[in-house]
């Protein structure tokens, strides 16, 4: 098929070529070594933006705090964090006037949602800083260790099931003179070595009770653990990201839910919608601006970029915002919403692993953990690190953490910060001048539209917007923002020119083989191509090419070339033998050396379904054997989810259809974890899995409801089994003897 590539771009704006300029196919850069340097950079930068604010020392933690709100107004274009509280409140007042009843409705909905939210909501989420072991754990594990430790201190709110009583426990825990908790300690045992002389030292993890004082506990509760952000393209240097602990999570959740309710009803907000819904919102905004443009006037669009969005924002502004938004709510809910910002304005950053230094002779290396950073002479560090440490000194605590009262960490309060950005966009005009502005905001990304009679007035509007933002602690970057006539801009990596330009290059990294298993990988590969045709404007010629490239990649990955190919190899020997003995060769899966019959018409059909009628009966029987022990039939039925990593933005979850067959194998867990102190975690996980299986055996899935009331799982199961036994006995399906035995068993457990 000879196509002159020039034809592809006839009648297409030049922006459509964006896909050709963005071929991110390689492996993205990952960080290695210590993240301490990046975290210290963040701490120093954040304090520099706020350095003219009020400084004081916290009564509770003894940390040095900085409050930049209502600080001096900037005299230059450098980024600064001096938000003026009255300006923030006035911007919110205007938002309230423009959207009457929005704040009350959002608060009411958030409050009602909070009342029925259960504690298990906190198990959603990835890594969470666990205060009992001072490191990151999966969210569910961190919640579990917290609840079990709380019980030791007579805090049993979690047993009631609701999020509110658990949050009440968190508040109470901050007042306890000391906290007891379970931690894991390694006990070293000397054992004689079997196969050689001498001894082996075996580490045995033990669960032990431990105590910490109130101040120590508060410091841990306020700590954010920091890591280096991985796989970030297009940047030379890495940056730090933070993980909050379980104490902060519950409160943040409610505030973010409140802000989400507001964002959903603001036409300028790019959150929480995504994909095609977001594109529709953007197209509407553009159309609205163009229709409002004065006759003979001009409409400009700024593709905006904010300098250090997170580091110039301040929790104290968020406190003022939640207070203003919940103004008409009950006092308990207002208090509840104010906790998250208060905790954040006292937050403490953990600095990570510390630095590695080498001896003068370069022979010896040593890791200096964070608590000891200042206990060795500064001359031992290189110049860059020495300069960092000198600036860090005023905010350093002896436990190896740093006080970080100003600034927000990445990923926290995305919705609420969007509300702040939209508030700036909603002001529209200052001093009744001859221009109007409007725009779109999604976390730290924005697009600004300005309408005016001529270019100079447009520029005046943009400058006024720039100054307005400064009053709210938002710093629009004059170097990185650029201005065009409306109809051409970029917002959240969506490129617009008289409509959205197709941009599937972003998705190119995810076109490869996912690496789950042969069956899932084929389904995922085809689904991604299908989704890109639907959502990202990928054309038929490109899609056809993508299918062929994917199949080639798939065959190379799993070493399963066509049965009639000349490729040699262990697996190919078996495949060729199968090829020889098969009549319906079109029915062989690609993973078994069969041909590819995917094209643009049948992308959405799982391969097994597509080839079902072409298969030889004995091949079909082997492929779809229901008793095959290597296939987890239950876990593969119906829709599954895969994690897809595009070049930009977060990992996306994607649904795909898969039919379980011989190629749907499950891999075993890595066994090296069994010798670490996380072994307890695995044993607990297995225990939970057994409980859940037992529960599912008692209740068929149709009778699941969201739990209300205070029953334990045990009570619910016993109750259900009693009912079932009685019904079976009364209808004659169960003998009297069996019925009495069943009741006796339930009696032994203590429920009758």
UniProtKB/Swiss-Prot annotation:
Per UniProt, subcellular location reads as: Host nucleus; Host cytoplasm
For this chain, the Swiss-Prot or TrEMBL PTM comment says:
Phosphorylated by host PRKCA.
The sequence motif named Nuclear localization signal is recorded at 187-195, 203-216
Q: Which reaction does it catalyse?
A: RNA(n) + a ribonucleoside 5'-triphosphate = RNA(n+1) + diphosphate
Top-level enzyme category: transferase
Query: What main location does UniProt list?
Result: host cell
Q: What superkingdom heads the lineage?
A: Viruses
- Which GO annotations describe the biological process of this protein? DNA-templated transcription; symbiont-mediated suppression of host gene expression; symbiont-mediated suppression of host mRNA transcription via inhibition of RNA polymerase II activity; viral RNA genome replication; viral transcription
Segment Promoter-binding site: which positions?
A: 249-256
Q: Which EC numbers does the record give?
A: 2.7.7.48
**Coiled-coil positions:** none
A GO cellular component annotation in the UniProt record: host cell nucleus
Q: Which PROSITE patterns match?
A: RDRP_SSRNA_NEG_SEG
Keywords, A to Z?
Answer: Eukaryotic host gene expression shutoff by virus, Eukaryotic host transcription shutoff by virus, Host cytoplasm, Host gene expression shutoff by virus, Host nucleus, Host-virus interaction, Inhibition of host RNA polymerase II by virus, Nucleotide-binding, Nucleotidyltransferase, Phosphoprotein, RNA-directed RNA polymerase, Transferase, Viral RNA replication, Viral transcription
What does the function comment of this entry state? RNA-dependent RNA polymerase which is responsible for replication and transcription of virus RNA segments. The transcription of viral mRNAs occurs by a unique mechanism called cap-snatching. 5' methylated caps of cellular mRNAs are cleaved after 10-13 nucleotides by PA. In turn, these short capped RNAs are used as primers by PB1 for transcription of viral mRNAs. During virus replication, PB1 initiates RNA synthesis and copy vRNA into complementary RNA (cRNA) which in turn serves as a template for the production of more vRNAs.
Annotated family:
Belongs to the influenza viruses polymerase PB1 family.
Q: Which HAMAP family match?
A: INFV_RDRP
Record note on quaternary structure: Influenza RNA polymerase is composed of three subunits: PB1, PB2 and PA. Interacts (via N-terminus) with PA (via C-terminus). Interacts (via C-terminus) with PB2 (via N-terminus); this interaction is essential for transcription initiation.
| Name of this chain's protein | RNA-directed RNA polymerase catalytic subunit
Q: Which organism is it from?
A: Influenza B virus (strain B/Panama/45/1990)
Q: What gene does the UniProt entry assign to this protein?
A: PB1
């Amino acid at each position: 098929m000879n196509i002159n590539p020039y034809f592809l771009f006839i009648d297409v704006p030049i922006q459509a070529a964006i896909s050709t300029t963005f071929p991110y196919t390689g492996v993205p850069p990952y960080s290695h070594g210590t993240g301490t340097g990046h975290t210290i950079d963040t701490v120093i930068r954040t304090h520099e933006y706020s350095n003219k604010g009020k400084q004081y020392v916290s009564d509770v933690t003894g940390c040095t705090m900085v409050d930049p709100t209502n600080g001096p107004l900037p005299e230059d274009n450098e980024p600064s964090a001096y938000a003026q509280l009255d300006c923030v409140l006035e911007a919110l007042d205007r938002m309230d006037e423009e959207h009457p009843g929005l704040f009350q409705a959002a608060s009411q909905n958030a409050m009602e949602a909070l009342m029925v939210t259960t504690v298990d909501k906190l198990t959603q989420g990835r890594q969470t800083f666990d205060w009992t072991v001072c490191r990151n754990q999966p969210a569910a594990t961190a919640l579990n260790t917290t609840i079990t430790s709380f019980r030791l201190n007579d805090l049993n709110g979690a047993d009631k099931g609701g999020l509110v009583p658990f949050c009440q426990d968190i508040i109470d825990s901050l007042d306890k003179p000391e906290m007891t908790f379970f931690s894991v300690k390694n006990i070293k045992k000397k054992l004689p070595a079997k196969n050689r002389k001498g001894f082996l030292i075996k580490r045995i993890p033990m669960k032990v009770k431990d105590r910490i004082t109130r101040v120590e506990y508060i410091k841990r509760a306020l700590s954010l653990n920091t890591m280096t952000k991985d796989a970030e393209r297009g940047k030379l240097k890495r940056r730090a990201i933070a993980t909050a602990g379980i104490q902060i999570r519950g409160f943040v959740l409610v505030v973010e839910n409140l802000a989400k309710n507001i964002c959903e009803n603001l036409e300028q907000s790019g959150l929480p919608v995504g994909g095609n819904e977001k594109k529709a919102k953007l197209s509407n905004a553009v159309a609205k601006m163009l229709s409002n443009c004065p006759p003979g006037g001009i409409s400009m669009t700024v593709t905006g970029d904010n300098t250090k969005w997170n580091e110039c924002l301040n929790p104290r502004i968020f406190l003022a915002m939640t207070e203003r938004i919940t103004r008409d709510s009950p006092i308990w809910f207002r208090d509840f919403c104010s906790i998250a910002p208060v905790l954040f304005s006292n937050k403490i950053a953990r600095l990570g692993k510390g630095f590695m230094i080498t001896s003068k002779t370069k022979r010896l290396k040593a890791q200096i953990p964070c608590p000891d950073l200042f206990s060795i002479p500064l001359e031992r560090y290189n110049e860059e690190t020495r300069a960092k440490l000198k600036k860090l000194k005023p905010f350093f605590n002896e436990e190896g953490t740093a006080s970080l009262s100003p600034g927000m960490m990445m990923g926290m309060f995305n919705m609420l910060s969007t509300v702040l950005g939209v508030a700036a966009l909603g002001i529209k005009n200052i001093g009744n001048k001859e221009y109007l502005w409007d725009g779109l905001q999604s976390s730290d990304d924005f697009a600004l539209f300005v309408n005016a009679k001529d270019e100079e007035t447009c520029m005046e509007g943009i400058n006024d917007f720039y100054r307005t933002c400064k009053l709210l602690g938002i710093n629009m970057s004059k170097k990185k923002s650029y201005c065009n006539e409306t109809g051409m801009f970029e917002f959240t990596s969506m490129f617009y020119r008289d409509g959205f330009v197709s941009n599937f290059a972003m998705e190119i990294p995810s076109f490869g083989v996912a690496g789950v298993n042969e069956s899932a990988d084929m389904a995922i590969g085809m689904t991604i191509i299908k989704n890109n045709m639907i959502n990202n404007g990928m054309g038929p010629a490109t899609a056809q090419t993508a299918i062929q490239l994917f199949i080639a990649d798939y065959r190379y990955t799993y070493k399963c070339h066509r049965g009639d190919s000349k490729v040699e190899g262990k697996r190919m020997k078996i495949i060729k033998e199968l090829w020889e003995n098969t009549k319906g060769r079109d029915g062989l899966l690609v993973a078994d050396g069969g041909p590819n019959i995917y094209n643009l018409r049948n992308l959405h059909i799982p391969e097994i379904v597509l080839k079902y009628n072409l298969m030889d009966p004995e091949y079909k029987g082997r492929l779809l054997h229901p008793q095959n022990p290597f296939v987890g039939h239950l876990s593969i039925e119906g829709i599954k989810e895969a994690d897809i990593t595009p070049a930009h933005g977060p990992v996306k979850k994607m649904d795909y259809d898969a039919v379980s067959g011989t190629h749907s194998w499950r891999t075993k867990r890595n066994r090296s974890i069994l010798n670490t102190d996380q072994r307890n975690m695995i044993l607990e996980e297995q225990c939970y899995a057994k409980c859940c299986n037992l529960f599912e055996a008692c209740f068929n899935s149709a009778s699941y409801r969201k739990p209300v009331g205070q029953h334990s799982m045990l009570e619910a199961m016993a109750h259900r089994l009693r009912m079932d036994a009685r019904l079976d006995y009364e209808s004659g399906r169960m003998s009297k003897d069996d019925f009495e035995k069943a009741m006796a068993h339930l009696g032994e457990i203590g429920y009758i």
